Amino acid sequence: MNRYRRFLEDKGYDVSKQWAEFSERVTYRKFIQNEIIVSPGEKNANIYILETGCIRYFTVNDGKEFTHDILEAPSAFASMFGIDANEISTVNIQALTDSDVYILKPDDAEYLNTKYPGFRQIGDRSFTEFGKNRILQSGKIKMMSPKERYLDFLENRPGLANLIPQYIIASYLGITPESLSRIRKRLYKKQ
């Protein structure tokens, strides 16, 4: 979990007091590529720490997948509406690559929140930042042409273009796989 600790410290969080106990309370799990981590309808209040790999949030409507977000390590994630132990997930969370993940159970998170007041602040700020970034990205995408969306994706997520399937990128950008294929062909012809 060293990558995630450095990530938090780079953001200005002091995790030195609670890190040892935090590390003892998480469990490690390796998710293989395409494995579903959380499914819709599942009660899941776990907090996941993505140490290596890449995951996506997606839903399925009338047999069609809609990718809502893609996260790269290091980061933390949870079911969007499954943070409360009584709430039910409305999304799939899937490992897009083999991913090393640490899982913090709700009881352990509550214990750490009580013992270390700063721990809750880290979680609250992290999930607020995640939500804010998602809203900004969603708004930005609506204002761009499909070509601009793809160019923005290449600029801001350069490692993902060759790492994950193109149909997932197309879904994330809100365009069809065929449109993405045409855009890519035009861009590569210009090079």
Where are these regions (language model features)?
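A small-molecule sensor/coupling module
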Residues: 89, 108-145, 149
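Short beta-strand segments in beta-sandwich/barrel cores
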Residues: 27, 54-58, 100-101
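Phosphate-/nucleic-acid-contacting segments
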Residues: 144-191
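Short acidic-glycine-tyrosine-enriched beta hairpin
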Residues: 61-77
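Cyclic nucleotide-binding regulatory module and flanking cytosolic helices
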Residues: 1-28, 82
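Glycine- and acidic-residue-biased ligand/ion/polar-headgroup-sensing regions
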Residues: 34, 45-56, 73-74
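Short phosphate-coordinating micro-motif centered on Lys-Gly-acidic
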Residues: 37-42
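Ligand-binding loop in jelly-roll beta-barrel domains
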Residues: 65, 84-107
